[in-house]
């Protein structure tokens, strides 16, 4: 049966995706592999391997206007995930009977034959974030975050090219054209949250892959222990005794949040998930991935400095998340990347919204003196309460839920409302 695995990257991660491809071919030589590049090369690109495809040139189902709209209103992660069902459609159009998506920061340790077998009798295969029933949850990644972001992790997704698989892809395409934001206030989280619908829509046509050895990742390290047998095969078991013990072969690991440039230097360091515990048994997989990146330094370095095409206006000014969401609220149809009189760039510039300081990555984890700032905000809200009184203060807080979304602040640049 003709099968294809693929990933989606901005062009700076082509090298990381090639390392994923190497791991796939080592363990699964009969499975084809593709890399869909979400952005473009502004100049003549270096010679690209045949497996690398420029998405804008090959994907169907989106007009030029829709592509531009999505490329601007979504940030890099949102955009790469938003085109995922269109990539599935492209793979199916090329005649493949089964398609597997893997995030570029995944490394495959053994055969994916069990996934292929699952799709023999199902239309879709997904991996949950966590597979054990933990009455007393001890994971560092909070349960509420998985409730918000989705029960399944879309670092992996397998779909069969049958009637139900194609229907899911079409359904997914329609929603991700406009609803692939990471916006908790409206229950959206990229392409991933939509998969919570699959048990209801597909019922027994969905295969939930509960193997401990699939999509092993930082958010489930707390429940899974790594071990290696005398033959060198890596296995995964439950770390605690609150679930019936299992012994599953390690298939693939999702190295999400690792600092890949540091890995290239031989340094294992993670950038996401606060207070993540270091488990000694993880050294086996961490060192394997580190060694793979070190061995492919030239591959990794070939594209890593390439800028994200859709990260700036045509004059080089950076596009912030606030710009993207504000544009989305205006429902404009002209090219938002353009600069000059009468453009979106001109409108936000006149309101002082063009700054070089990087504010998108500022959070409570990296901002200085967070406790002092929280105390200052508490004093500010205390003053508001005294000025407004109980009733108006409560109603004001309710309004903040509405106005926490940048789309609701179009009045800042919309002359008719200002």
Predicted feature locations:
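Glycosyltransferase catalytic domains, chiefly GT-A lineage
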Residues: 1-418
């Amino acid at each position: 049966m003709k099968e294809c695995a693929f990933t989606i990257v901005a062009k700076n991660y082509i090298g990381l995706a090639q390392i994923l491809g190497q791991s796939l071919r080592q363990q699964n030589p009969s499975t084809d592999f593709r890399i869909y590049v979400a952005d473009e090369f502004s100049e003549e690109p270096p010679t690209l391997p045949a497996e690398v495809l420029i998405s804008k040139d090959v994907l169907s189902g989106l007009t030029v206007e829709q592509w531009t709209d999505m490329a601007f209103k979504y940030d890099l992660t949102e955009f790469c995930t938003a085109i995922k069902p269109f990539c599935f459609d492209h793979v199916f159009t090329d005649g493949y009977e089964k398609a597997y998506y893997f995030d570029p920061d995944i490394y495959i340790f053994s055969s994916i034959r069990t996934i292929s077998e699952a799709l023999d009798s199902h239309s879709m295969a997904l991996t949950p974030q966590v597979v054990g029933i933990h009455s007393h949850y001890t994971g560092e990644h909070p349960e509420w975050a998985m409730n918000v972001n989705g029960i399944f992790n879309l670092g992996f997704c397998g779909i069969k090219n049958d009637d139900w698989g194609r229907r899911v892809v079409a359904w997914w395409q329609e929603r991700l054209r406009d609803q692939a934001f990471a916006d908790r206030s409206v229950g959206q989280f990229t392409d991933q949250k939509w998969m919570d619908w699959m048990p209801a829509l597909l019922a027994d046509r969905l295969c939930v892959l509960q193997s401990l050895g699939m999509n092993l990742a930082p958010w489930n390290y707390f429940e899974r222990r790594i071990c290696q047998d005398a033959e060198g095969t890596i296995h995964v078991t439950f770390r605690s005794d609150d679930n019936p013990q299992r012994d599953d072969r390690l298939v693939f690991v999702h190295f999400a949040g690792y600092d890949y440039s540091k890995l290239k230097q031989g340094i294992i360091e993670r950038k996401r998930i606060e207070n993540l515990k270091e488990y000694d048994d993880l050294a086996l997989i961490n060192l394997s991935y580190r060694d793979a990146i070190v061995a492919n330094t030239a591959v990794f370095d070939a594209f890593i400095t390439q800028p994200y095409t859709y990260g700036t206006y045509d004059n080089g000014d950076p596009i912030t998340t606030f710009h993207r969401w504000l544009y989305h609220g205006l429902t404009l149809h002209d090219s938002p990347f353009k600069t000059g009189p009468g453009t979106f760039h001109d409108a936000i510039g006149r309101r002082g919204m063009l700054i070089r300081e990087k504010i998108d990555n500022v959070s409570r984890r990296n901002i200085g003196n967070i406790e002092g700032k929280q105390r200052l905000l508490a004093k500010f809200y205390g003053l508001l309460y005294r000025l407004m009184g109980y009733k108006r203060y409560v109603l004001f807080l309710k309004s903040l839920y509405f106005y926490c979304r940048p789309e609701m602040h179009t009045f800042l640049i919309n002359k008719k409302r200002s």
